[in-house]
Amino acid sequence: MCLLRQEGKEDGILGKSILRMIIDLPKNVENIIERLKEHGFEGFAVGGCVRDSLLKKTPKDWDITTDALPVDMKKIFKKTFDTGIAHGTVTVLMDGVGYELTTYRIDGNYSDGRHPDSVSFSKSLSEDLCRRDFTINAMAYSNKKGIVDLFDGRKDLQNGIIRAVGDAKKRFD
C-alpha cells in the first residue's frame, strides 16, 4: 500500500502537493495533453522528464500518464502503435517522434524485478504515482495543474536524496 504525505486527504492531489511552476513542455506534449482534455481525459507529463526539467536538463523523452484507456488513445490520435497494451501503454507518433502514453494503473507483484505480473487500470493520478520507484520519478506536470508532487520528490531532488515511494524493502525485495 502506498501512503501519501497528505494529512486528511487520501487522494492527495489538493493542497500543498500541487506546486505552481512552469516547465517548458514541447509543443507536441502540450498538444497531446490538450487533445486528451478535449476528449474528457486528464494528461500529465510524468517521471524522468519532469525530474530532468527541474534539474534544467533536456529530457531524453517525454512520457505522459492519463486516465484514458489504450482504446481511447487510439481513437483520439491518428498515428499510434501498441507498445505495451497489457500495461496500458500506447506510443503516439507526432512529427516523427514517439511519445509513450500510459493509463493510470496500480501494479501487482514484480517477479522479474522490472515488469509487473499484473496491472489494474485506475482513474486516479495519485494511485499511478504510488507505483513509481523513487520520489524524484513520482512527479507529474501539466500546464494547467502545475507540478503534482505527492511524495516530496522536488525536495529530495534539491537535497540530493534518492528515496523510494513507500516501503523500500517491499518495493525492491
List the model feature ranges, each with a label:
Residues 2-4, 10-173:
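Catalytic cores of the polymerase beta-like nucleotidyltransferase superfamily
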